[in-house]
């Protein structure tokens, strides 16, 4: 069943802009551990996007993009495929254990050892959170550089690569600290190998390398008893039930006025509101005033206010970080330290923190002089496309 495509991506990407500028003559591909990253990096007009399949470890794509390069298909089914090498892959420390000293709160000096086998559940998802995923991405990227003709045409080509530098198995940052240090150490070597290959095949003088990162932060964290000095638990299900009762008391009990909750956003029943010929702005405002009184709620912003321009510097992040066709009717910001408890045993409790994620953006290429600039950037796509 086809599950992935960029059709729900509302913005243009750098790859899209390159396709437009070259009138379709440039090749644009992306490689990433997961489908979302691959498709977001590729865009609508790309030639292809590839990610590692969680069931067999092969490089997968979507039928939205037409055709698979022959060398990708050969790699997937040949002697170099991941499945043919999996049993020999063992992750152990690359350096002596005393070299992993970046985190002072590490509690032990025990070495680690992880193996990967299709006999075990989550084999490939686990591998995708180890340094091996970056090496596999490099191996496929080298196929593109060797056989894809990158840099040999009159128009520039683009190969977008997403590496993984998070915690093993998605655990908390305080766990597997030796592992994440080893991941960074090996990633540095992987990037070096990629740049050396580009230099040999195309020449770094003929290449623009754009390096950036999204930052890494896991909101799930546990505190020893008695050390959490502020905060509490916010239960979205209880909040929705009380909000629906409140709106029923005002507008009638013949329907449910609340549709659902997702990612700190509440969605109202738009069809019921339209059928009842109610004013959406008024209803959103009443709901926001009600939610604002909940313990732990710092701010409630209505989707209508963001759409009509009735927003300020404090709520600008909601407007810039959401699309009006997907945005909830109410966007909730909790106070720092409060936990979001979805009342689902399968979901971890999320602790709300205000984190400033510093995002590096490095340009390297012929004619670019070394310099360091710190700036608050609103739009990066036009700048990258221009460069």
Language-model region placement:
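C-terminal, low-complexity/hydrophilic appendages and adjacent surface loops
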Residues: 326, 334-369
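His/Asp/Glu-rich, glycine-adjacent segments
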Residues: 1-155, 164-171, 292-299, 341
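Loop/turn elements at helix/coil->beta-strand transitions in domains of secreted/extracellular proteins
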Residues: 24-27, 154-158, 204-208, 326-328
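Extended hydrophobic/aromatic segments used for targeting, binding, or gating
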Residues: 46, 158, 171-190, 197
């Amino acid at each position: 069943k086809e599950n992935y495509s960029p059709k729900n991506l509302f913005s243009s990407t750098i790859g899209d802009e390159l396709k437009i500028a070259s009138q379709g003559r440039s090749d644009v591909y992306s490689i990433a551990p997961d489908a979302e990253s691959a498709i977001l990096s590729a865009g609508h007009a790309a030639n292809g996007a590839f990610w590692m399949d969680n069931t067999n470890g092969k490089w997968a794509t979507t039928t939205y993009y037409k055709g698979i390069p022959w060398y990708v298909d050969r790699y997937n089914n040949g002697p170099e495929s991941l499945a043919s090498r999996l049993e020999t892959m063992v992750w152990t420390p690359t350096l002596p254990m005393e070299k992993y000293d970046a985190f002072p709160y590490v509690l032990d000096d025990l070495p680690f050892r992880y193996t990967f086998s299709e006999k075990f559940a989550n084999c490939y998802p686990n591998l995708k959170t180890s340094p091996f995923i970056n090496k596999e991405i490099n191996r496929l990227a080298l196929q593109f550089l060797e056989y894809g003709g990158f840099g040999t045409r009159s128009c520039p080509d683009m190969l977008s690569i997403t590496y993984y530098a998070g915690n093993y198995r998605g655990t908390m940052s305080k766990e597997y600290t030796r592992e994440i240090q080893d991941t960074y150490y090996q990633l540095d070597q992987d990037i070096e190998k990629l740049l050396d290959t580009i230099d040999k095949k195309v020449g770094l003088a003929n290449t623009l390398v754009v390096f950036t990162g999204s930052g890494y932060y896991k909101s799930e964290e546990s505190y020893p008893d008695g050390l959490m000095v502020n905060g509490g638990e916010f239960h979205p299900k209880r909040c929705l039930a009380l909000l629906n009762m409140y709106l029923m008391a005002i507008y009638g009990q013949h329907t449910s006025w609340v549709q659902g909750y997702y990612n700190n956003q509440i969605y109202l029943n738009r069809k019921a509101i339209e059928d009842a010929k109610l004013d959406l702005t008024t209803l959103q405002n009443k709901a926001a005033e009600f939610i604002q009184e909940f313990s732990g709620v710092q701010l409630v912003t209505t989707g209508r206010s963001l759409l009509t321009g009735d927003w300020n510097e404090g709520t600008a992040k909601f407007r810039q970080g959401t699309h009006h066709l997907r945005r909830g009717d109410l966007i909730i910001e909790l106070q720092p330290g409060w936990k979001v408890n979805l009342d689902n045993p399968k979901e971890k409790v999320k602790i709300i923190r205000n984190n400033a994620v510093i995002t590096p953006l490095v340009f390297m290429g012929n004619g670019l002089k070394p310099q360091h600039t710190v700036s608050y950037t609103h739009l990066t796509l036009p700048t990258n496309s221009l460069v």
